[in-house]
Every structure is written in C-alpha cells, then in structure tokens.
Amino acid sequence: MATFVDTVTLHLRAGNGGNGCVSVRREKFKPLAGPDGGNGGNGGDIVLVADPQVTTLLAYHRGPHRSSRNGGPGMGDHRHGTLGEALELHVPVGTVVKDADGNELADMATPGMRFIAAEAGQGGLGNASLATTKRKAPGFALLGTRGYEGDVVLELKVVADVALVGYPSAGKSSLVAAISAAKPKIADYPFTTLHPNLGVVEVADSRYTVADVPGLIEGASEGKGLGLEFLRHVERCSALLHVLDCATLDPGRDPISDLDIILTELAAYPVPDGQVPLLDRPQLIALNKIDVPEARELAELVRPELEARGYRVFDISTVSHDGLRQLSFALAELVEDARTKAAEEPEAPRIVLRPRAVNEKPFTIRVDGGSYGDIYRVIGTKPERWVQQTDFTNDEAVGYLADRLAKLGVEDGLFKAGAVAGSSVVIGEGDGIVFDWEPTLTSTAELITSPRGADARVDPISRRTNQARREDYFARMDAKAEARAQLVREGEAGLWADEDGTDEDASSDAKA
C-alpha cells in the first residue's frame, strides 16, 4: 500500500448559496408593515492551507471527493440564512495547485499560506432587500448561486535546502541516515527509494534539511525510470550534492561517466520561469564507499579531474562515517550563502487580482447558427449570475430579470446584433436558459399595479382566483336563463310542432 503520494486529483464541490425568503410581515394594528424576508446565507469555500506538519498527499489520494456546506435559506422576520462552514484542506508546504488543463493556480511554498481552491455560491436576497420606492412589497426573492464544482490537481515538490542526486544504489539514503535522524529504507538493490526522504542536519549554529531524491538514470529528463517524478523534487533545493558510487561493479560505469549523465539530465530538465537552472546552483561532490579498498583507489584516481572542473570533492563512507563531518560543514556553508543571497534579493512581485473597471463592457453577444435559425448568446458574469438567481416559476421574478438585463444594456446589444422579436436568446455558455425574446416596452412604473408575484409582460399561468370563478358561474347562469327565455319566445311564435303536425304549447312545456 502506498505511504507517500505526491500527485493527486481532487474533486471539489463548494457550498451553494441559500435562497432568499418571500415574506410579508403580518401584525395586528400594522397593516402596512411591509416585506420581511431575509437573505440566504453564503456557502462555504474550500480552502487549501500549507501545513508544515503534513508531508504527503496520501489522505487525499484515498478520499479525493471533498465538499463544503451550503448556506441556509432566509426566513421571515428579517432572519438571514446561516453561513456555510468553510472546509480547510491541509497540504504539505511546496504543493503546487493546478487546474484540470495544467495551468498553475497557486504555489503553496510558504507555511500558513491559504488559497481558495473552490469558491462558494452567494446567498440570494430576500424580498425585504429587494423593496424599493416603486416596488414596495416584492412577491419574489433571489435564489442562491451555485458553488464551484470541478477538479484541481495537487502536485507536491519537496522543499529542502540540499538535494542528494546520483545513480540508484549510490548510497544517498545511507548518507541521509548517517548525517541526520531520518530513517529511510535501505537495501542492496536499485530503486529502493521510491519517494523523497527528508532529514534535518544540525552543524554548530546551522540547521538545514537534505532531501534524498530517488535514483536518476540516463533519460530521466524524458521520463525514463520515473525521472520526471524524481526531478520535480529538485526544483526547490538551493544546493546539490552529487553522490558518486566508487564501488560499483556495473560494466561501463565509473564516477566520471555517472556524473556526466546526471549533469546531462539536470541540464535537460526545464525549471519554472523565475527559478535558477539546476546546473547554476551550488554543487558539491561526495565520492562514497571509500571504506572499500578498491573504491578508495578509484576515488584518488578521479579526484584530480573533478577538482579540475571546479568541484569541491569529499571522500566519504556512510559505513565508517569517514569525511561526513567535513561534508556537513561544507553543506552548511553553501546553505548559509544561499540564504544570504535570497535575503538580499528583492522579493518577487506579489500577484494582485484587481476587479474589472466600471466602464468595462459587462457582457458580449455572439451569434451562433442553429438548425432553426440564429441563436443570440449573451456571455457575461452578471447576466449569467442573474439567471441563476431567478425563480422562473414566479412571473414577477422573471420581469425583474428582464428589467435588470434591459438596464445593463442587453436589449440594446441584441438590437445592434440583429435580433428581432421572437429570436432565440441564450444566456451563458453550453445549454443555458433559452428565451424567445420580446423587447421590453412597459416601464417599471407601469408594472407596480400588477398583483404581487405577477408581471404584465408574462402570460398568466397561475390558476383562477375565486372572483374569476364567481364571474364565470354567473355568466353561465345568465346564459342558461337566456336560452330558456328564447325557447319560450319561439314556442309562443309557433315555431315548434309535434310529429303529427299539430302545434305544441311550448310555454306550458317550458313551465312544466
């Protein structure tokens, strides 16, 4: 079973906003108390938090589906809905957040950093908040909007000061175990280490972390041997330590050729913009396993060539601990120098998300061809949100939506795009709400005489009132009385006769 996971896909669903409430205050001796419907509560966001106590994404590998709570609906007496509780997901420091298309959304490189991965829906307004001087008692409320629902990819990149790189079985895990309190898995076969191991080294007044990166082989920068998975963890390290095996028995291998292959793979690996290339970072070389006589001889043989290339070379043994103290102090010097340079460099500019300008066009209109004629598609944040907030079972709410769209300039835009009465209009991408567009001719002031919950521009679809039923009943009774009177008049005029040809007393029959 996996115990270390550095890449996972999360399926997130943020909480929806609560619906607003339609309510009118009814209290003795206060006939004009007005509307008192409360607003719906906002849903809960899903927030990622960089936590130094978390070292793996294993918990999200086993449970990738996460959702936050919805906002509560509004209630009467001006009571607002409850706020949905935000869901905090703790991730390791160094986690990179990407969308489903691979675009980077956030880099959780600082402990305590927070990022809203899924934004919650907004609560709808109650009719008390929608009341105006012209619409004193709205018979509708706005619905809550839906929260974000989608996938994000979490990719962990280990944050350490020094990365140990080298061929498999070069002794990197043994070195981490020898200079720190870490206890990585150690065995006598290649690729024993399948995930990075971190160790903390304390030397005099210096303290730094080292990362045991799994073994690299030729072609690692192209993905061979899971190389891309391994090289990703080298990106954030400020210094590199090449661990070279001087006791290898593989044909065709020696410390010089191993170093050349590792350098080639490091040079071919693309680092993100703004980061120092891997080969431009401080590097040291450790010739390992000198406790073996043949290995010590080989180390003495290759040392001059490595020093001629400009490297500082250390002969070490993780078994006898020879040279480890000198190596630890040398690594501490590199780390302190890197930290000093990082403190002197100006801080990277902070990305600030600014709201759109007031005069920016709030929507666009696109004409799409359809099988039954042109479809005019309205794309914009406001129109799409307003459609989500509209209760289409309430005629007054539909009329309010029409007023908002007209005030925003959607109708003028449709006219300019060539739309005519009866044209199909869709708001939003995909299968949005389809309208048979009718231009608004009635002003809001003329609509205030409509009963609550109705709009004169929308065909009435509600059932008949008691007054309408009474009027229909009396109309039917009057029609029956008129029919009887007509029969009497026709009988008196002799228009009716029996089968034998004699006249029938229509009036007596009508009375009977």
Curated annotation (Swiss-Prot):
Q: Which PROSITE patterns does this chain map to?
A: G_OBG (PS51710), GTP1_OBG (PS00905), OBG (PS51883), OCT (PS51881)
Query: Domain of life here?
Result: Bacteria
Query: What are the entry keywords?
Result: Cytoplasm, GTP-binding, Hydrolase, Magnesium, Metal-binding, Nucleotide-binding
Domain Obg as annotated: residue spans: 2-159
- In this entry, which stretches build a coiled coil? none
Residues annotated as binding Mg(2+): S173, T193
Q: Where is the OCT domain?
A: 355-439
Per UniProt, where does GTP bind?
166-173, 191-195, 212-215, 288-291, 317-319
What family name appears in the similarity comment? Answer: Belongs to the TRAFAC class OBG-HflX-like GTPase superfamily. OBG GTPase family.
- SUBUNIT field: Monomer.
What this protein is called in its record is GTPase Obg
Q: Which organism is it from?
A: Clavibacter michiganensis subsp. michiganensis (strain NCPPB 382)
